Amino acid sequence: SIGFILHQTFDSTDVLYPKQISSMLFQIISVDVLVAWCVSIRNRILNKQIRRYLILVGILMIFWLTVRIVKWRFLSVTDPMGRYLWYAYYIPMIMIPLFGVFIVQYAGKREDYVIPKKFNLLFIPSFALLVFIFTNDIHRCVFEFPEGIINYNDIYDYKWGFFIVVAWFVSLGFYFTVMLLVKSRVPGSRSFQRLPAVIMVLAAGLWALYSLGILKIDLAAMDCLIIALLLESAIQSGLIRSNTGYNELFE
């Protein structure tokens, strides 16, 4: 139960403030919702390749939120392991947009369709970006720590490498959304089908404000919410086919 989880998470000497409790409850509920979403994807999505990649996206989001819980609740803010868990946030941030590209390539195709091998080359920059992030302690080209690395959690600056990661995340997200809209040929409900594009535009705006330091928000929660909304809106609007009685949507 939620009570048991909270008891295990906070020891008896902790002072539980309402903000802490509400934050922990939100994280637990978010993970539960994502697990349920993955199960529903298995039952709803017709194309097995799209189904597989959507489930992988769900697993990555669960990983993202779980890593966040471990970092903030079980580790000291000066623990080096916490810094690498912070870097681990970027595993889903880099891989989820890539899986989105694969999803859109399979959209509307036969079950035996195999995407061109050239798309596998996208794994190269993905893994290169991950290596770049996890070696940040050496080159400091993603994050810089003006007050020393021991204070990484409180005082850090974004460097040029961070904006490359943002560009990857946003550009592939736009590619996913635009290509779904281009492939769709349903004559009605265009306003609802444009919802994924609207979500992506709002996401880009939030990312820009966050990167410039104007907006202070929970990055992991925001990104998971945006991703889930984007994918579910594509399913509900028929841009990704499901077993809910839609006619042919793609050429």
Where are these regions (language model features)?
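Alpha-helical transmembrane segments of multi-pass integral membrane proteins
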Residues: 43-66, 87, 118-126, 156-212
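Short, hydrophobic transmembrane alpha-helix segments
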Residues: 8-22, 39-48, 212
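Individual alpha-helical transmembrane segments in multi-pass integral membrane proteins
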Residues: 17-32, 47-133
